[in-house]
Structures are given as structure tokens and as C-alpha cells.
Amino acid sequence: MESNQIIYILFAIIFFGAWFLLLLVLSKVSGWQKLAISYAAPEKFLGEKLRMQSIKMGRAHYQSSATLGTNSEVLYLSVLLPFHIGHPNLTIPYSDISGVEHKSLFLGHVEIRVAKASSVKIKLRKTQADWLEANSNNIWKYDRA
């Protein structure tokens, strides 16, 4: 094997190893792992979806890489395939979710808390929370400021 081939192989191993480790750390600091303990999606999700969304969870910001989904029973969360390591799809029953609107000077957001992982904060844009509310057949509502 030539030295160039060895360098390419080592680079690939290091790159994919670092990517794997980074995603595991991200799932830990965001709280995704904690949510997955109780809310990992058992099957394919049936409902409305918004793809390529940005959300904040814990100390992580999922920029245009999250999918939000809803039906009359659950909130569905997933990430794009390249980021799926350590991030199983989640289905969280609306009965376990509370949301509170927070207003700021220009844009507001809605902070979601989940019963079985109350330390995890999920921040959505108000428009995303409004979409969830409307497409959950108004089963879920957040507290407005």
C-alpha cells in the first residue's frame, strides 16, 4: 500500500470517528439522549411534518436540520440522516408537554418542557409552536405571554 493511500485511510477513520464522537456529545448536551430514554419513537410516524427546521434544545442549536411533526397525539422530532447518530426519532405525547411563550424585542419563542425530562428545554419559534398547535387539532396549547 502506498503512503498516500494510508494517509487517505487514516484521514477517513479520524474524520468519521470525530463525527461520531461529536454527534454523541451533541445528543448528550442537548438533552436528546435523556428524552430518548422515555420517548424514542417505536414506529414510523404518521402525521404532518415540517422539515429542515431550526430548534434549540439544551445547549445545542439544530440549524435547519430538525423535523417537527404532529398529529392529534404526539409531537415528533427527528434530525437529518447525517446527524442521526445518537439522535433516535422521538414521539412525545402532548399530555407530557407544556409550553410557555417568551417575548423579546423582535422575535418571541416558545419554550417547551417535557414531563419525564423536565431539565430539557426545547425552544421553538412562535410560528413553529403555532403550527404544532393548529395541526394537533388544538389538543396541545401553549401559555401565551
Predicted regions and their residues:
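Short charge-dense sequence patches
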Residues: 43-50, 79-87, 126-127
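Generic detection of short hydrophobic beta-strand segments and adjacent strand-loop junctions
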Residues: 50-53, 92, 122
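Short, surface-exposed coil-to-beta transition loops
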Residues: 62-65, 87, 109
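Cytosol-/stroma-facing membrane-proximal "stalk/adaptor" domains immediately downstream
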Residues: 98-145
